[in-house]
Amino acid sequence: MKGRRRRRREYCKFALLLVLYTLVLLLVPSVLDGGRDGDKGAEHCPGLQRSLGVWSLEAAAAGEREQGAEARAAEEGGANQSPRFPSNLSGAVGEAVSREKQHIYVHATWRTGSSFLGELFNQHPDVFYLYEPMWHLWQALYPGDAESLQGALRDMLRSLFRCDFSVLRLYAPPGDPAARAPDTANLTTAALFRWRTNKVICSPPLCPGAPRARAEVGLVEDTACERSCPPVAIRALEAECRKYPVVVIKDVRLLDLGVLVPLLRDPGLNLKVVQLFRDPRAVHNSRLKSRQGLLRESIQVLRTRQRGDRFHRVLLAHGVGARPGGQSRALPAAPRADFFLTGALEVICEAWLRDLLFARGAPAWLRRRYLRLRYEDLVRQPRAQLRRLLRFSGLRALAALDAFALNMTRGAAYGADRPFHLSARDAREAVHAWRERLSREQVRQVEAACAPAMRLLAYPRSGEEGDAEQPREGETPLEMDADGAT
């Protein structure tokens, strides 16, 4: 009897061990597969993951929810602070903002009116301004694709914002003697792209013989600057850069807003971003006018598609590339530039859409560091938009700058013999010229490629009522902050 009970207990133990072993065998693969599924989910949309991953929006949002009433109180308190040093970061990221210097990046693309917007900063006496310094990098690394250069652009931007211009030595043309000091060791101001129109370079103290003082508002004549202002060592320009309370850099070669997140999180930079948009049809019209000057840049933008099927679909849509049956046709020489410009614009519109959705989902601290501006609003209401821009940047208003902005939008005509030369333009012509100069097929192509971004930016399709109307409620990509900035 006792032996039977002992055998029964041993049998129960064995059965229990067998059940536990079976459960372990079932759970281990399930856990491992779950981890792999999570990785697959992260890789499901790699393009969006690259953008959203760096922001850590969910973590930032969770941090904001934990702050609750404290974050709201901080925002209310920030509204009462001096506009010179606004409180722009909530406790969600725990950043200590540097209040000694403000950095602004003007985020735009080619032919959107960014030169005019940048010139408004260039004219302000409290601003140290650089015009498209990343041009040097693109020229040195051509031919490349825009996407692979984004990290290098960000690193270059970080150095320039810190008034460290030694990075330019990596990309300066080796055969340009004017760009180097007599000892050939250091660069000079002549190494900077468009240095002849820079207000700091073309005015005292760097240029004692300049016809205008730094505080005097007015366009710099490039030939006059070259004649009166011999190049000086780049170290002297770095010293001047450190004196200014606001540093502004305008460029058109950074495609994704998400690339700037490490800089926005850097408490030592105190960075804000002004992103400029323009009706894609007007952009395309302007790009066609200056097609040869933009050909290299368009190729670099379009090369980002060579790694995907969409690039081949673009080729087929334009009647070139491999077709079923193995037949292919080379691109005709005449419309080659137009083809590259059209394809590049499609890539740009996709980047716009990513930026708009990206900023729309950003936490509150980041939205307060981002200003969305449409070119049409800037040229139609220059004074109002200038006040909005200066308030966002922490800069004082100037009557002379107000008059300058108004005069620059009241020119005699839109067309110019020098498409890359800044001059006064007719604002109405600048807004509506595409209607008369683009064919119906060209308009159709642009609207088909850019429809999602156009909808978020409140640009109506051709044939619809209105033109560049203000975004309707519920369609704005970003919420307004207390200042009305988006």
Swiss-Prot record:
A GO cellular component entry from the record: Golgi membrane
Record protein name field: Carbohydrate sulfotransferase 7
Enzyme Commission numbers on file: 2.8.2.-, 2.8.2.17
Membrane topology according to the record: Single-pass type II membrane protein
Lumenal compartment spans: 35-486
Region (Disordered) residue spans: 66-92, 459-486
GO molecular function, one term: N-acetylglucosamine 6-O-sulfotransferase activity
Subcellular locations according to the entry: Golgi apparatus membrane
Highest taxon listed in the record's lineage: Eukaryota
